[in-house]
Swiss-Prot record:
PANTHER family: EUKARYOTIC TRANSLATION INITIATION FACTOR 2 SUBUNIT 1. Pfam families: EIF_2_alpha (PF07541), S1 (PF00575). The gene is eif2a. This is Translation initiation factor 2 subunit alpha. eIF-2 functions in the early steps of protein synthesis by forming a ternary complex with GTP and initiator tRNA. The lineage of its organism: Archaea, Methanobacteriati, Methanobacteriota, Thermococci, Thermococcales.
């Protein structure tokens, strides 16, 4: 079970918790990411509507995503709320938790290869990476994308070779793909060749950038679709803007017209394994 580097959660933090004991006035929950820490959820924090029977909402052994509303480390008190968690926040937290589980499994594998126990791995790798990146899997993603050198100085050097092997084989680099259409016309006998050359030049120039992939698809005159895959949305938009400027410039010089068409900003998230 993945655990946080901190001893106590912070107010406003979302946590994964397991219901341990239920009473008429509230419930006690164990914090999955903070071993040995128990929290209390008053019945008024279970749901937005009046709760007649708390057992209609909570069951022993049930895992929930809750929001930390009060923390008193001196007394060891932690208060949680279920009603203050939106569906989107719940989904995001569960995704984060799954990523932490993946990171833990990978670190256990690395520790086994290095002949170390997980407690040593947690102290030497997990804690410093979480403190620097916020989550360990994000550090592994950066290492898969930019090279293991990004971890140098954060973890002992003896871990780098085995972590390099792990991230290259098991960590996928997240990417996004956006699409748009160009409407292009060149009223000349060789207009088709001019358009083709403009698209090829724009595509090849963009594809020279690291982790960028651009593809054009003929949609039927005068429309051409473009798909851009990049590490993140902002980079994809930047590439689209550069390509649009280049195409518009070349087509205008040739005496034609080009327009970028975007009815809406559509983003398709994909994951591409690093090769």
């Amino acid at each position: 079970m993945p655990r946080k580097a901190r001893e106590y959660p912070e107010e406003g933090e979302f946590v994964v918790a397991t219901v341990k004991r239920i009473h008429n006035y509230g419930a006690f929950l164990e914090l999955d990411e903070y071993p040995g820490k128990e929290a209390f959820m008053h019945i008024s924090e279970v749901a937005s509507t009046w709760v007649r029977n708390i057992r209609d909402y909570l069951k022993e052994g049930q895992k929930v995503v809750a929001k930390v509303i009060r923390v008193d480390p001196r007394k060891g008190h932690i208060d949680l709320s279920l009603r203050r968690v939106t569906q989107q926040q719940r989904k995001a937290k569960l995704q984060e938790f799954k990523r932490a589980q993946k990171a833990e499994n990978l670190l256990r594998l690395a520790a086994e290869k290095l002949g170390k126990d997980f407690e040593a791995a947690w102290r030497e790798v997990w804690v410093p990476l979480e403190e620097e990146w916020g989550e360990v899997y994000a550090a592994f993603e950066d290492a898969a994308k930019d090279g293991i050198e990004v971890l140098k100085g954060h973890v002992p050097d003896e871990w780098l070779p085995v972590l390099k092997e792990i991230v290259e084989n098991y960590v996928e680099v997240p990417t996004v793909t956006i699409d748009a259409e160009f409407e292009i016309t060149v009223p000349k006998p060789n207009g088709v060749e001019i358009i083709k050359e403009a698209l090829i030049r724009a595509r090849d120039r963009a594809n020279k950038e690291k982790d960028i992939e651009v593809k054009f698809t003929y949609q039927g005159a005068p429309r051409y679709r473009i798909d851009i895959t990049a590490p993140d949305y902002y980079k994809a938009e930047e590439v689209l803007e550069d390509i649009a400027e280049e195409i518009l410039r070349v087509i205008k010089q040739a005496g034609g017209e080009a327009t970028l068409l975007r009815k809406e900003k559509r983003i398709r998230k994909v994951k591409k394994r690093k090769k």
